[in-house]
């Protein structure tokens, strides 16, 4: 579904296209540019693209809620790169720094340390907490303004966030750090919704954007309870689910409060009889044909995540 009711954001932007992608556009073999700059902007301005046109979409998991999505023509988007808290309020969550990967668009859902390390990747453009509509080539991003979940779900943090930070975390008077913008990325004929740490029941005005998305990325266990996830899935009826925001051995520390989602994944298979795909790598390629007829299929990266 193409969203036409949100006001467009008019921007001239930069992106990265691989040499293979530019070859698809021109029909000729074009080697990748040795320079990391906006050279490919000229190409995409000339060729454009259609986000609804079917094609292969690559999804790479960089841990936590960070996913690199590559469109059929090579536009790249990275969601929610992570870092450790610099204020001293929270302990060290991550063993390493986020890798300095090259990407066209860096996108964040909200201003928390585990989602907003937008300066770590070598991004040609940064869209922080996008609200509205943005289009580039064969990617269209729709940002939906809502609110962060204002009380952590057990066993995330035994502490109360409002008391720790001495700020108001719940609407309507929450600080900006507890705003959240759900991001819907449309490309290759697929609509992929990145939930961020949004509350379990968004503003009803957002429902028609979220219903029947193809892929829904949800922060299972640590942010949302299983009952909340079940309610979201029933309400929006996605073709596929990807759990995020969970404990990864080799990435997260024991004091992070992040939890395993193995139990939730097992329940999806045994209790809900979902088609669970346990992946053996940190990347996944999807297309509309692959998901046709699917309902609540689970793609689980397990402990596989990209490290560079």
Describe every region a protein language model picked out:
Residues 24-32:
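Cysteine-centric segments in proteins
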Residues 165-236, 244-249, 253:
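Active-site-proximal loop/helix segments of hydrolase catalytic cores
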Residues 7-17:
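Bacterial N-terminal signal peptides
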Residues 38-56, 60-107, 111, 115-126, ...:
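Pre-active-site segment of Zn-dependent metallo-hydrolases
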Residues 1-5:
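Positively charged n-region of N-terminal signal peptides that target proteins for export
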Residues 177, 240-308:
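Binuclear metal-ion centers of metallo-dependent hydrolases, dominated by the metallo-beta-lactamase
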Residues 19-23:
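Sec/Tat signal peptide C-region and signal peptidase I cleavage site
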Residues 51-57, 71-76, 135-141, 184-192, ...:
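Beta-strand-turn-beta hairpins that frame and shape the catalytic cleft
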